[in-house]
């Protein structure tokens, strides 16, 4: 399975577009964060829906909260968190700042629940890591665990 096929499989034909695959690839390269990790966060946060709006004013694909990321958004020139590329850039910039490549479980728990993450955020982190492993397996031509 190639990258576009994976994004389409995960997000469905309507949401898993070539543009989404390209945008994830772009920010993955910019921030040196694995694209399957970003896709896993996108699925976990919004089910790939760029218009997703959570109860805490979390917005877009990666459910970024403007109240907590206003400075980051200003630095990045982000004005619309419902724009997929702007949202991906903001969320991935935060993951990169959390050093997700060094300690994914801890970084993802903070991403989800703040700097003192509750237990549910550790469960979230584990589910993202498991999903990433499954996606990596599909990209490498086999089912995870087979």
Features from the language model and the residues they span:
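Catalytic glycan-binding domains that act on GlcNAc-containing polysaccharides
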Residues: 2-146
């Amino acid at each position: 399975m190639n990258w576009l096929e994976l994004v389409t499989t995960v997000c469905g034909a309507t949401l898993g577009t070539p543009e989404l695959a390209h945008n994830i690839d772009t920010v993955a390269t910019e921030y040196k964060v694995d694209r399957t990790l970003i896709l896993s966060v996108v699925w976990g946060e919004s089910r790939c829906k760029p218009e997703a709006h959570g109860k805490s004013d979390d917005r877009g694909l990666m459910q970024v909260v403007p109240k907590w990321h206003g400075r980051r958004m200003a630095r990045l020139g982000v004005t619309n968190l419902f724009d997929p590329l702007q949202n991906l850039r903001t969320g991935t910039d935060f993951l990169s700042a959390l050093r997700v490549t060094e300690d994914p479980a801890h970084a993802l728990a903070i991403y989800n629940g703040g700097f003192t993450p509750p237990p549910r955020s550790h469960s979230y982190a584990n589910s993202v890591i498991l999903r990433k492993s499954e996606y990596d397996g599909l990209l490498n031509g086999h089912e995870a665990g087979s």
